[in-house]
Amino acid sequence: MTTSIIERIDAWAEKTPDFPCYEYAGTRLSYKELKRQSDAFGSFLLNNLNTDKEKPIIVYGHMSPLMLIAFLGSIKSGRAYVPVDVSMPVERIEQIKKAADPSMFICTEELPSNLTITGCPVLSQEQLMDALEKHFDEVPDKAECVKNDDNYYIIYTSGSTGNPKGVQISQNNLVSFSNWILQDFSLRQGLRFLNQAPFSFDLSVMDLYPSLLSGGTLVPLDKTITANMKDLYREIPAQNFDVWVSTPSFADLCLLDENFNQENNPSLTRFLFCGEVLAKKTATELLDRFPDAVIYNTYGPTEATVAVTQVKVTRELIEAYPSLPLGVIKPDMRLHIVDQETGEILPEGEKGEIILIGASVSKGYLNEPEKTDQVFFDYKGYQAYHTGDSGIIKDGYLFFQGRLDFQIKLHGYRIELEDIENNLKKVSYIQNCAIIPKMKDEKVDMLVAQVIPTNHDFEKEYQLSAAIKNELKEFMPAYMIPRKWIYKTEFPLTMNGKIDRKALNSEVNK
């Protein structure tokens, strides 16, 4: 049982010093080097930062080993880290920087030329390397390290106002999650883990920390590989993965390659899925192609530390229900299905809101007390969270029944539809809009934008769409930009004058 994340990771530097903890783009980082360099960086921060430790450190980059060194160095200095990926638009990065009010902004990659960070110290990649060299062999005082209920990391998720919210995850939250994953999923020492998700997406926590805590090797597939199917299909068997952690959509992409099977990936014996609905079709095909593998379906919001339920997917389970269950709750958590209006706990078999209670639940949103109070609450002395997800319990299993609001999961990313709409309304060509998820195989396949445009001079609709997307890419992440565009002169309205989303949904999902 882990009680300290850092102590457990550092222990591998003694047990297996030369074993690779991270392999990326031809470089290998050993456990000994991870400890030495994160110690050096923690020492640098303690020597150079006099600000309140409540202020986190933003770590900007992609999948360089420097990201891990910066994460753990921040923790050793007593400060939480905020991962920010290079794929984020400048405006989003600026929003996160403003909301987080960090003590430092660390760059493991070069910043975009049109982004200027002010209001806090900025450490360039070159300065980071100099700091690691200057503080070589220095070891920070263990008493300074993040501990107990201190924030460990803060991940920013989509917010309904168009501004992201920072979910605070404590050392205790992460310890609870990690112990559960290592025990319930039987993750032994020395395994090779796939890292598909960028570190700014909390699915990455499901591979990053189980890998480091079990003395394994984390192997990321960065955006240059995942964006090119030929490269992706060539790289996967070459990496000899033991543990696969991804969204179901990423597995669907890989299943398009007929060579993605047990014969070509003999060591691949565990699939862990989170982030969106796992379709029965996907699970069945994986069982067919990987007869030696175990497949786990999991569920959980960022606010409850990645995942809180799990179930082993078997052919019997697939045949038993119309859709796959999300599983059973982890031992130190409780789950209730409640009536959204009255808050009354509902019996098994009745649909209502999923409420999560216990050790995995976040303390709330960073510097956002009002938003925190809207969804977090105390339940008999335990931290609890209104997920906004609709669920039902059958035979002891939790089943997902959709969102109670306008929030959806697309390719593992949690997205507020209002967030997209608010951003679309900034575009000069858009008068009004509504975002409708297009469903396929029990999950969101793509986003459809229904738009009432302003007056324009374009002859063809595709020209208008191109102009809109050109504006959007300046301030909205690519995964949030709708794939299909439908233009209207007016929207249907409900009796109380609101956009009739049910009618629009019926048009999209015929």
Curated annotation (Swiss-Prot):
Pathway as given in its UniProt record = Cell wall biogenesis; lipoteichoic acid biosynthesis
* UniProt keyword Cell membrane present: no
Q: Where in the cell is it found?
A: Cytoplasm
GO CC terms in record:
cytoplasm
Catalysed reactions, as listed in the record: holo-[D-alanyl-carrier protein] + D-alanine + ATP = D-alanyl-[D-alanyl-carrier protein] + AMP + diphosphate
Alphabetized Pfam families for the sequence:
AMP-binding, AMP-binding_C
The primary site where this protein sits is: cytoplasm
Entry binding sites for ATP: T157, S158, N297, T298, Y299, G300, P301, T302, D389, K498
Record keywords, A-Z: ATP-binding, Cytoplasm, Ligase, Nucleotide-binding
- State the Gene Ontology BP annotations: lipoteichoic acid biosynthetic process
Q: What molecular function terms (GO) are annotated for this protein?
A: ATP binding; D-alanine [D-alanyl carrier protein] ligase activity
Q: Quote the InterPro entries the UniProt record gives.
A: AA_adenyl_dom, AMP-bd_C, AMP-bd_C_sf, AMP-binding_CS, AMP-dep_synth/lig_dom, ANL_N_sf, DltA, DltA-like
Keyword Cell wall biogenesis/degradation recorded: no
Sequence positions that bind D-alanine: D202, V306, K498
Write down the EC number.
6.2.1.54
Q: Which family does it belong to?
A: Belongs to the ATP-dependent AMP-binding enzyme family. DltA subfamily.
Role, per record: Catalyzes the first step in the D-alanylation of lipoteichoic acid (LTA), the activation of D-alanine and its transfer onto the D-alanyl carrier protein (Dcp) DltC. In an ATP-dependent two-step reaction, forms a high energy D-alanyl-AMP intermediate, followed by transfer of the D-alanyl residue as a thiol ester to the phosphopantheinyl prosthetic group of the Dcp. D-alanylation of LTA plays an important role in modulating the properties of the cell wall in Gram-positive bacteria, influencing the net charge of the cell wall.
Protein name from the UniProt record: D-alanine--D-alanyl carrier protein ligase
Lineage, highest ranks first = Bacteria, Bacillati, Bacillota, Bacilli, Bacillales
